[in-house]
């Protein structure tokens, strides 16, 4: 794995919804049995090459649950990911409590404005 950090959005970048599905796309996400998310035909072949060269950091608006539904090709699941607009850092699929506490502290004084 390389020393370069490759930060990437997921939806409509690396992963596409069923609404944008192409005939050769590969399903990598299901919800209640229904196909939800897809990689392009090339993505499963290219991801191993990417993760050998760089640290892949997905950054997404997805919730933890939505992110964890993604079935990454063998050996390509990112060790870290930012979910919930960066509020939650996952390390090997587990919430980084220190990151979460720091995120909450940043918005503490602005909750009223954010809720409006």
Please name every model-derived segment.
Residues 39-116:
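Active-site phosphate-binding/coordination module
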Residues 2-6, 10-58:
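Active-site neighborhood of HAD-like aspartate-dependent phosphohydrolases
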Residues 1-2, 86:
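Generic structural motif recognizing short loop/turn segments at the entrances and edges of beta-strands
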